[in-house]
Amino acid sequence: MRVSPLLSLFALAAASAAKGRPKQREVSPVFNIDGKNQYFAGTNTWWMSHLTSDADVEQAMSQIADSGLKVTRVWAFGNTNTGADQPVYFQFLDTTKKTITINNGTNGIARLDAAVAAAEKHGIQLVLPMLNNWDDLGGINTYCAYFGCTHESFWTHAEAQKAYRDYVTFIVNRYKDSPAIFSWQLCNEPRCQNCETSVITSWATELSSFIKSLDPKHRVSLGDEGWLCSDDTSLGYAYSCSEGIDFEANLKISTLDYGTVHMYPIGWGYTYPWGNQWIRDHAALALKYGKPIVLEEYGVESTTSNRTAVLQQWQQTIIDSDIAYDSFWQFGTNLPSGANPYDDYAMFYGTQEYQDVVIDHAQAISKKAVSTAARRRASSRRPN
C-alpha cells in the first residue's frame, strides 16, 4: 500500500543482537514457524523502522506479541536524494555529488536495528521489503532521479539495478544471522505498466537468486499484489495483467519461497464480497503449485460502517481456504511519543474492534489443523 510520509519523532539508536538461525522449512502450503507447521496471523507496521523513539518501538512490538500475532511487515527501505526530506532515512542517493551512501547516524540504519532487536526480544518475525514501488520514503524514483531512468526502465537499467543490489547486499548481510527474519522481500507492490509481464518475472528470478546466494537460509518473497492474467475481460482489472504482473508465472520461480497477495476491493473497482473470491482464487494456486500463499495486506477504512463484519467474513474465508497466513493493514497503537504514523485502515490495540478482528482471528487460525496431505509434502518445500 501507499503510505503518507512520517511525522516529527525523537531520535535514539539501538543495536541489533546477532543470533544464528537454522534453515527455514515449510510444509506446503503452510509455513514452519516457531518449530511447528501451522497457520497463523500477522500484521503490517511499515513505520516501525522509521520511529525515532525506542520506547515507541518497544511498546508496539510488545503489543503485537501480546495479540498472538507471529509476523509483522516492516519497511527496510528509506531512500532520499536530498538527505533532508525524511526524518529517518537509510540510503542517500546524492544527485549533486553523485554519491550513494548509507546513513549510519542516529536517524539512519540504527532505527531499523532497533526494530529488529525488538522483534528478537518479543519473538516476532519480520518481513523486510527493501524497495518501494511508490514514492513514499523514497522508492524507485530516487534511483531514477540519480541514474536517469524511468519507472518502466528501472527494472532492466544496469546501473540502477547494481545500486539496488548493493543496498540489498548491505541489508541481507547485516541481519541474516538474526532469528527475527521471516523473509527478504524484493519490493513493496512492484508494478510496470505498459510492460510485458516477463520484465518483472525476469527481474524477480534474477534478484531472488542473488539473495539466495547471499543467504540460503531465509525465505525470499516478491511483495506483489497477486495480479492474475485471464482472457475473460468480464473479470475486470485485477485479472487483466495491466500492471505488468503475472502472479502465476512468478509463483513458479524456484527462488521465491511463497506468493504474496494484497486486497483492496473498493479501490480496485470491486465490492467487499468480491474479496472472498480473490482469496479463494489464490488459495487454489497454493494447492496447484505446492507453495504457501500469504494474504499480506488487506483492510477496510475505519469510516466503513460494517468494517468489522466485512473483515470477519474475509477472515472466515481465509480459515476455510489454504492461505498460509494473513496480515491485516495495519496495526495501530497510541505510542508514548505521541507519534501517529497511521492511515484510515489502522486497527487500534485495546479496542473492542481489535479484539473482535485481530485477537479472536489470531486465536482461531492458530487452531486450524494442517491437513494430512500437506504433511506428506513436508520435506519437499523448503527455501532453496
Model-derived features with residue positions:
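Short acidic/histidine-rich active-site segments
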Residues: 295-298
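Secondary-structure junction/capping motif
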Residues: 2, 364-368
